[in-house]
Structure formats: C-alpha cells, structure tokens
Curated annotation (Swiss-Prot):
Keywords from the UniProt entry: Cell shape, Cell wall biogenesis/degradation, Chaperone, Cytoplasm, RNA-binding
GO terms (BP aspect): cell wall organization; peptidoglycan biosynthetic process; regulation of cell shape
One GO CC term on file: cytoplasm
SUPFAM superfamilies: Prokaryotic type KH domain (KH-domain type II)
Domain of life: Bacteria
Protein source organism: Halalkalibacterium halodurans (strain ATCC BAA-125 / DSM 18197 / FERM 7344 / JCM 9153 / C-125) (Bacillus halodurans)
Protein name (record): RNA-binding protein KhpA
PANTHER family registered for this protein in UniProt: RNA-BINDING PROTEIN KHPA, UPF0109 PROTEIN SCO5592
Subcellular location: Cytoplasm
GO molecular function: RNA binding
Length: 76
C-alpha cells in the first residue's frame, strides 16, 4: 500500500524527493500518512479536493481487494 501511494504521489508533484509516506498498522486497519513539499500540496489535494479524493479511492479499492481497512491522511 505504501509503495502505491508513493508511486502515485511522486508522479503528481514537482519535488518527488520530498514525498514521504509512513504506514501504521494497528491490527484492525492501516493508517497511511502522505507528506509532500509545501509547494506541491495544491497538486496533491487538487481543485476542490478532487485529486485527493481520487487518490483515496484508488487506495481504498486496493485495500478492499486485500480485505483491509485503510485511512489515508495528507499532512503538511
């Protein structure tokens, strides 16, 4: 899951070296935190949050296939 988020985020941003993804598994669900360069935050969130929503949809679909629950947070 981490590599999926990392790969998509790196394709979206101008500063791919500043993309950081961390995973925390509490047994019941997977919590993923995505951090990007401040200049790239708008690209990851998108107009009215559409890009962030699409990214979450892809991650949720991948998690569903693995019968997992996942939460994706974009942090600054």
């Amino acid at each position: 899951m981490k590599t999926l988020v990392e790969h998509i985020a790196m394709a979206l941003v101008d500063h791919p070296d500043d993309v950081r993804v961390s995973e925390h598994d509490d047994g019941h669900s997977l919590h993923i935190e995505l951090s990007v360069h401040p200049d790239d935050m708008g690209k990851v969130i998108g107009k009215q949050g559409r890009t962030a929503k699409a990214l979450r949809s892809v991650v949720y679909a991948a998690a569903t296939k693995q019968k997992r629950r996942v939460r994706l947070d974009i942090i600054d």
